Design a protein with these regions (language model features):
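Glycine-rich, proline-tolerant flexible connector loops at the mouths of alpha/beta enzymes
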Residues: 40-61, 80, 112, 198-199, ...
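N-terminal beta1-alpha1-beta2 module of alpha/beta enzyme domains
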Residues: 1-68, 72-73, 168-171, 358-363
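An alpha-helical appendage that flanks or caps ligand/catalytic pockets
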Residues: 7, 125-161, 202-316, 345, ...
């Protein structure tokens, strides 16, 4: 099983903690993960999402991370493509692929926050079409000596990237998939897919089953993609200690970040667009969230069982854990990650699931 970190880069509403300290602390966690032998580190892109996610430019952070790590594969998850000029993305990814010496993974998506689209004066309703156009341009620039494209939203003429990619034809790609269109695009192109907590395990399994069906039907060329789950995770020496320490931070996470917030004309935050009130209440119940596989929390032995369970339920071959959520201190996050690396990772390394050929769930 492939194992990695996901990072929203939360500031925890701590007015004393500076942004300098925030970014330093996340680089420290990443360095530890690299030394521990984890496979992936992914960072989110969010804008004006105060406290919840403080990395508006994943490429800038990954450039710094590339010089502090040696083996772990690094990537954005995701570049919100409607907010970017695709030519700029193609160039930036090429630069990062060189800075990482071929350790770059690259996630693309349409975004989940209307407020950031309003701030950038980008029509929210057109995000899917814009994403697909941008993706065509980015891949076209990477794979052609000279590329021309004229679409409804983006156009380019005789563009070539002056920076050659280290990985050919391009770095491995990832895409969160919720809609039928995104599932079709990802699976038919051999792009890895990922699901987070809000959808729930049943929805994740349905999306993965549809992805597998399209992948088997279209049989895209290239290396095999991954099917992954991302979860907040807290590991402690015992189940009791994990629940005592983890409950406050889990509830803090959903109380402060799971509801609708508005920024004047910029509209509501992303989570409020995919979470209704009843689902939010379910997630705020820590025991319910642990039982349904939305929150990974416990001793190392318990966590091994929890991850195996959700991987088997969804047919996933990759697990990404967010170790820095809620108001966890740096010491708590690093201790949780240390226990994971020392006692959980060895048990999961030989746990294998053939995710692309996993049997479809019974109706």
């Amino acid at each position: 099983m492939k194992l990695g970190l996901f990072d929203h880069m939360q500031k925890h509403d701590n007015p004393v903690r500076s942004y300098v300290d925030l970014y330093k602390s996340h680089l420290e966690v990443l360095e530890f993960a690299d030394q521990a032998g984890m496979d992936f580190y992914f960072v989110a892109e969010h804008h004006f999402d105060m406290g919840f996610s403080e990395c508006p430019s994943p490429g800038a952070f990954l450039g710094a991370a590339s010089q502090r790590t040696k083996n772990i594969r690094l990537g954005p998850l995701v570049y919100v493509l409607p907010l970017w000029n695709p030519i700029r993305v193609a160039e930036e990814v090429a630069l990062l692929d060189n800075l990482t010496e071929g350790r770059l993974e690259c996630g693309f998506g349409a975004g989940i926050g209307p407020f950031s689209f309003a701030a950038y004066n980008i029509p929210w309703e057109q995000k899917r079409e814009m994403t697909l156009e941008a993706l065509r341009i980015i891949k076209g620039i990477w794979t052609h000596e000279s590329f021309t494209f004229e679409g409804r939203y983006f156009k380019c003429k005789d563009i070539d990237s002056s920076i050659p990619l280290v990985q050919k034809p391009h770095p491995p790609l990832w895409m969160p998939t919720r809609s039928k269109n995104s599932i079709e695009e990802a699976a038919s192109s051999g792009i890895s897919t990922i699901q987070w907590v809000p959808a729930g395990m049943k929805a994740a399994r349905r999306a993965f089953d549809e992805y597998r069906e399209v992948y088997q039907r279209t049989k895209p060329s290239g290396s095999k993609p991954h099917i992954g789950l991302m979860r907040e995770i807290f590991v402690a020496e015992s189940d009791r200690q994990a629940r005592i320490d983890g409950e406050f931070h889990w509830k803090n996470f959903w109380e402060r970040r799971g509801g609708a917030r508005t920024y004047g004309a910029h509209g509501s935050t992303g989570l409020s667009t995919i979470l209704d009130g009843s689902r939010r209440q379910e997630l705020m119940d820590m025991e319910h969230s642990i039982a349904e596989g939305s929150f990974i929390c416990g001793s190392p032995e318990t966590v091994v069982g929890q991850i195996k369970k959700i991987a088997n339920e969804a047919g996933a071959d990759t697990f990404l854990g967010e170790f820095t959520f809620g108001a966890l201190t740096q010491k708590q996050s690093l201790n949780s990650l240390r226990l994971f690396a020392e006692q959980v990772m060895p048990e999961l390394r030989n746990f294998a699931i053939d995710a692309l050929n996993f049997p479809r769930a019974e109706a």
